[in-house]
Amino acid sequence: MPNGSANKLPHVTTRRMLDMKERGEKIAVLTAYDYTMARILDRSGVDAILVGDSASNVFSGHNTTLPITVDEMIYHAKAVVRGVQAETSRAMVIVDMPFMSYQLSPEDAVRNAGKIMKEHECDAVKMEGGKVIAEAVKRITDIGIPVMGHLGLMPQSIYKYGSYKVRAKEGDEAEQLMEDARILEESGAFAIVLEKIPSKLAGEVSRSLTIPTIGIGAGPECDGQVLVINDMLGLNTEFHPRFVRRYADLSSVIEKAVQSYVADVRANSFPSEDESY
C-alpha cells in the first residue's frame, strides 16, 4: 500500500508480523470501516486494521455478518485505505471476505480475493474456516495474496452453532481446531484469528505455529489481540461480552454533545456572532 504521508514509518507487512511473533512483541489490531476512524487508528499506533464483516452489524444494523456483500466490503475498505494513506501508512489493512464469497469453490475464492485486493490496494484478506477452505487459501496465496485465517467461533457459521458461546471446550472440537490451525499454516496463511476459545487451548495453538495468532476472547497467550472498535470505545451499549474491555464511554460523550447542540440551536445561542460571516 503506497504511503501518502510525509511522516513515513515502516509499513507493517506479513514479514513484520512474523518478526513480531519471533521477538515476543504483541500485535495490536482493531477494526475500522471508515476514513476518519482509520486515520485515528493509524496515527495511534495500531499494527493492523481489520475491515471486518462486523460492519454488517455495527455499521448497517444487521443481526449477523451474513448480509454484507463483496461490493460493500470494498466500499468500506477503500475508505479505510485512504485514511491510512492520509496518515503514517504504517498499519496493515486486512479485509474480511464476506459470507459466500469463497465457500462455493477455490476459483470463486480466488476471483473475489483478487477483486478485493485490486480495487483498493489493501494488504491481505481474511477467511473463516479450517480444512474445508484449505485449497482456497493455498490457491489465493499461490497467486500472491496474503490470507489471514479465522478459527474458533466463526460468525459466518452462527446458524450452524445456534449461539455465540465459547467454542472448542471439548476434546474433539479442540483437537480439530489444532489440526485446522496446522492446515491453514501449511496452506500459506500468514496469521490466524482465534475467537472465543479457552485461553489454554489458544496458548497451545499459538506455541504450535510459526505464524502469529490474533485473539478475540481467547486469552492473553495469543500473539496479538483484536477488538471491534465500536465495542472497545463504548459506542455499542447493548453488547458487552466478557472479553471486551471498554477503554471509553463514547456513547455517553456523543449523547451529551448532541443534547448540548440541540439545546443551543433551540435557544438560538448557536451560531454566535463569532461563528457567523
UniProtKB/Swiss-Prot annotation:
Its EC number is 2.1.2.11. Pfam families: Pantoate_transf. Catalyzes the reversible reaction in which hydroxymethyl group from 5,10-methylenetetrahydrofolate is transferred onto alpha-ketoisovalerate to form ketopantoate. Coiled coil: none annotated. The active site is at 195 (proton acceptor). Keywords: Cytoplasm, Magnesium, Metal-binding, Pantothenate biosynthesis, Transferase. Pathway: Cofactor biosynthesis; (R)-pantothenate biosynthesis; (R)-pantoate from 3-methyl-2-oxobutanoate: step 1/2. GO terms for cellular component: cytoplasm. It is found in: Cytoplasm. Its cofactor is Mg(2+). Belongs to the PanB family. It catalyses: 3-methyl-2-oxobutanoate + (6R)-5,10-methylene-5,6,7,8-tetrahydrofolate + H2O = 2-dehydropantoate + (6S)-5,6,7,8-tetrahydrofolate. This is 3-methyl-2-oxobutanoate hydroxymethyltransferase. 3-methyl-2-oxobutanoate binds at residues 53-54, 96, 126. GO terms for biological process: pantothenate biosynthetic process. Mg(2+) binds at residues 53, 96, 128. Homodecamer; pentamer of dimers. InterPro entries: Pantoate_hydroxy_MeTrfase, Pyrv/PenolPyrv_kinase-like_dom, Pyrv_kinase-like_dom_sf.
